[in-house]
């Protein structure tokens, strides 16, 4: 159960970077291009731009979505959070006031691509 969906705070950058780093390391097809520190800095930059909404579960950030205008720049969940409706709720939260959204996803990310199709996105 999600405690809250809220705008990300500067103090969330570390947890967001950890989620990104874990995904990068645990996903076979994902290029291992960035250090944990670089991913924390990237998360901080998205937060500073006001792009990020986080999902808090049990008092901890367990997922986030970043939107720049009509583009979804990132949607990541912590390990073990998939298939609980968190990604869908994050998408719903950022759709307010936006008639059109687009995103890019790795072709190899089959699970995410199926998720986006179920949410009404097209290829």
Regions found by a protein language model. Give the residues of each.
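Conserved GNAT-fold acetyl-CoA-binding loop/helix
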Residues: 13, 17-44
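A short helix-loop-beta-strand connector motif used in the catalytic cores of GNAT acetyltransferases and
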Residues: 42-54, 71
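Conserved N-terminal entry element of GNAT/NAT acetyltransferase domains
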Residues: 1-11
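Short hydrophobic beta-strand motif reused across regulatory alpha/beta modules
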Residues: 65-67, 121-122
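Conserved beta-hairpin
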Residues: 50-66
